[in-house]
Swiss-Prot record:
This is UvrABC system protein B. Residues 430-592 form the Helicase C-terminal domain. ATP binds at G38, I39, T40, G41, S42, G43, K44, T45. The beta-hairpin motif is involved in DNA binding. It is found in: Cytoplasm. The keyword Transferase does not apply. One of its GO terms (molecular function) is ATP binding.
């Protein structure tokens, strides 16, 4: 299938049809940058989906963290069930980069733990981009980090079709070059096995499907897709494309050329260090690099091989590394979600990485070429990005400058809900007034969100409200993911009436039951009380038809003035639209997606076990590995029903871990 097809009971409504038309008109007129100013609850994701369907272009959606990326991925997958919706984020559950602290003469080795499920999804994403056009890839900012060359990745692909001739030994050798491992006993992702005239391949982009190649001599007769757990045949395939088990696969000739390049740079660097009278650094660099060269010669790989990536990709010093952007077709479309956060994040990535590696190079731990194993500079990202739509309720200065301040607004909500009423009250005696407002709000059956400036104040306020017998909880940065979701569940169900936080009541926290957002010390100018922060926080009350926001301030700051004026402007537009179309605003309850994932876990594990697993990534990985072994053991004992149950539990845990990462 080459066309995008939305499967949904909803049609564009409110501002959505106009916004979709305007963005598409801008794309058609070759505008490189546009802004979709979408307020909370206006249906930004659904609007993006309709733009994708109508333009029918491969799309990359960038989000500023894994959690937001997972939410968008889940929503897009439900909207486009017949198309390729993929997920591309960092595959590390844990990552400690190598570093050297000169002050204490401490070298920290690289240490990491790779999430197999996310690695699988990364392979599925690059594969889809090379195989088809109806592709949406939802990514975190990790898409600007170095990836294997798309040219080599595609060049080394093995294309299999029934009726063609494939010399057996050559095919097995090709699979090994693709970094597939022969394993006739334990058959898992990234492996192949040989049984008589059959070769079974477990592709790197599947978790529950494998391919069986049936040969007559050297002729490939059939390709069957089968369940690797039960052995049941699922489908007969007309062709199969086997891509590398790593994005860094390369032919032997490339490895040989790289080794020559590394040796040449090593000699130049050693001469330089000697001229600087640095015997320790000279000896250290020579020893470490010679060991890596020996490993590359013998195995084609070495620990930290990514630090030599420039030699494998054929790039010159200082040139940008290949990234996911090079896998995108020329006519691809880019959405940058919550761009007011994502764009500064992209800008910051290069400098932090560079500072750490310069120290390693200076002290003889790495060759200067290691500096080219890096994320894209902001200027490079700016050059590589295709036509872009920046999506935010509060666009940043870069986006506004790129578009000349022109925005496409999504202000009318399909539900008819208005932006909340904003009330400014004196900060003097703010707690006393807050308690009165809390009583009024709770009496209506609504919940209250309170945002403070400091952790100490949040803790003290929570304790004080609890003393007054209010059902109060405190949300802060040290709350683990699972506990955070539990708190949100308790808030929505009424177990908690009041939630106190600092900077956690902004993007992505949608509570329809919230009738009041109280912003304490709103006149203290700064990051937490900037125009952007205030507008985002005000938006938390926009899911409720009776939602109100109280800003406690003794003076009117520029940020308060702009935030309240903008909210009032939007509210008036919404009121006029509702009056014209006879719409009565109504609160719509919506399940928090991550909450649904938590319920899934809860049904499989007891609460204590769930907390233990999700508070400790290492224990979660161990538990998943244990389940895999139990599943394979059950299958080998022909206990397929038990194996299927374990597989379902395993899938639930892996999906939940992805959602909650």
């Amino acid at each position: 299938m080459n066309n995008f097809s939305i499967i949904s009971e909803y049609k564009p409504a409110g501002d959505q049809p106009k916004a979709i038309d305007e963005i598409i008109a801008g794309l058609s007129s070759k505008k490189r940058s546009q802004i979709l100013l979408g307020i909370t609850g206006s249906g930004k994701t659904f609007t993006m989906a309709n733009i994708i369907e109508r333009t029918n272009r491969p799309t990359l959606i960038m989000a500023h963290n894994k959690t937001l990326a997972a939410q968008i991925y889940s929503e897009m997958k439900s909207i486009f069930p017949k198309n390729a919706v993929e997920y591309f984020v960092s595959y590390y559950d844990y990552y400690q980069p190598e570093a050297y602290i000169a002050r204490t003469d401490t070298f920290i080795e690289k240490d990491s733990s790779i999430n197999e499920q996310i690695d699988l999804m990364r392979h599925a994403a690059t594969r889809s981009l090379l195989e088809r056009r109806d592709v949406i890839v939802v990514s975190s900012v990790s898409c600007i980090y170095g990836l294997g060359s798309p040219d080599l990745y595609y060049q080394m692909m093995v294309n299999l079709e029934p009726g063609q001739s494939y010399p057996r030994d050559q095919l097995l050798n090709d699979l090994i070059n693709l970094q597939y491992e022969r394993n006739d006993i334990g058959f898992e992702r990234g492996c192949f096995r040989v049984k008589g005239d059959n070769i079974d391949i477990f592709p790197s982009h599947y978790s529950n499907k494998a391919w069986r190649l049936s040969f007559f001599g050297n002729e490939l007769e059939y390709i069957h897709e089968f369940d690797p757990l039960t052995g049941a045949k699922l489908a007969k395939l007309d062709k199969a494309m086997v891509f590398g088990n790593s994005h860094f696969v390369m032919p032997q000739e490339t490895v040989n050329n790289a080794i020559s390049g590394i040796e040449e740079e090593l000699q130049k660097r050693l001469e330089f260090l000697k001229s600087q009278d640095k015997p320790l650094e000279t000896q250290r660099l020579n020893q470490r690099t010679q060991y890596d060269l020996e490993m590359l010669t013998e195995t084609g790989n070495c620990k930290g091989v990514e630090n030599y990536s420039r030699f494998f990709t054929g790039r010159n010093a200082g040139e940008p590394p290949p990234t996911l952007f090079e896998y995108l077709p020329e006519d691809a479309l880019l959405f940058v979600d919550e761009s007011h956060v994502s764009v500064p994040q992209i800008r910051a990535m290069y400098n932090g990485d560079r500072a750490r590696k310069e120290v390693l190079v200076e002290h003889g731990f790495r060759l200067p070429s290691a500096l080219d194993n890096r994320p894209l500079k902001f200027e490079e990202w700016e050059k590589f990005r295709p036509q872009t739509v920046f999506v935010s309720a509060t666009p940043g200065p870069f986006e506004l400058e790129e578009t000349g301040g022109t925005v496409v607004e999504l202000i009318i909500r399909p539900t008819g809900l208005l932006d909340p009423e904003c009330i400014i009250k004196p900060a003097t005696n703010q707690i006393e007034d807050l308690i009165s407002e809390i009583q009024t709000t709770i009496a209506k059956g609504f919940r209250v969100l309170v945002t403070t400036l400091t952790k100490k104040m949040a803790e003290d306020l929570t304790a004080y409200l609890q003393e007054l017998k209010y059902k109060t909880s405190y949300l802060h940065s040290h709350v683990h993911t699972l506990e955070r979701i539990e708190i949100l569940r308790d808030l929505r169900q009424g177990t908690i009436d009041i939630l106190v936080g600092i900077n956690l009541l902004r993007e992505g926290l949608d509570i329809p039951e919230c009738g009041l957002v109280a912003i304490l010390d709103a006149d203290k100018e700064g990051f937490l009380r900037s125009e952007v922060s205030l507008i985002q926080t005000i938006g938390r009350a926009a899911r409720n038809s009776e939602g109100r926001v109280i800003l406690y301030a003794d003076k009117m700051t520029k940020s308060i003035d702009k935030a309240v004026s903008e909210t009032l402007r939007r509210r008036q537009i919404q009121q006029e639209y509702n009056a014209k179309h006879g719409i009565i605003p109504k609160t719509i309850n919506r399940t928090i997606h991550a909450l649904a994932e938590f319920e899934k876990i809860d049904s499989k594990l007891d609460k204590k076990q769930a907390h233990t697993l999700f508070d400790n990534p290492a224990k979660l990985k161990t538990h998943i590995d244990k389940l895999k072994k139990e599943m394979l053991k059950a299958a080998s004992n022909l206990e397929f029903e038990q194996a299927a149950k374990l597989r379902d539990q395993l899938k639930t845990l892996e999906e939940a871990a992805l959602e909650l990462s």
